């Protein structure tokens, strides 16, 4: 199990600020990369180091498929303990169902942070389909 590293709070804040400033673009700032960068900031490790480096939705899907995952929810569930969204803490990750599209996001002090095609959005925890504990 991955553990939280010293200074993870500051590193998490930096990741959130960086992604808020980046454009919505596959391989730059998307629903997987926000979560993977969060995991890296908190634990010092990427979830799947070879799953980055894509530039399109198809490329992202191929990276997940290489690990036999159909979506980010399956990728997260293979690495982390599933928890009830109401038990999630800052820095934990989760997914929402956005009209059939499974999108990853991060639990923050402001709500559940996700990225759509245009911007970062903070949603209420009640919108989260599944949550995953990132280190402890």
Residue positions per predicted region:
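N-terminal capping segments
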Residues: 1-66
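Low-complexity, intrinsically disordered short peptide segments enriched in small/polar/basic residues
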Residues: 2, 117, 122-125
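Generic alpha-helical propensity signal that fires on short helical segments
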Residues: 42, 112-114, 130-132
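...with weaker cross-activation on analogous glycine-rich loops/strands in unrelated enzymes
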Residues: 59-120
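Glycine- and charge-enriched low-complexity intrinsically disordered segments
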Residues: 123-136
């Amino acid at each position: 199990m991955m553990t939280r590293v010293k200074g993870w709070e500051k590193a998490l804040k930096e990741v959130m600020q960086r992604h808020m400033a980046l454009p919505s673009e596959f391989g730059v700032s998307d629903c997987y990369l926000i979560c993977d960068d969060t995991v890296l900031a908190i634990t010092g490790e990427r979830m799947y180091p070879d799953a980055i480096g894509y530039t399109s939705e198809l490329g992202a899907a191929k990276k997940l498929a290489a690990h036999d995952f159909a979506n980010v929810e399956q990728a997260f569930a293979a690495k982390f303990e599933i928890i009830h969204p109401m038990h999630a803490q800052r820095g934990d990750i989760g997914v929402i169902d956005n009209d059939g599209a499974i999108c990853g996001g991060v639990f923050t002090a402001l709500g559940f942070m996700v990225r759509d095609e245009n911007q970062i959005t903070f949603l209420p925890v009640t919108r989260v389909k599944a949550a995953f504990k990132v280190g402890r």
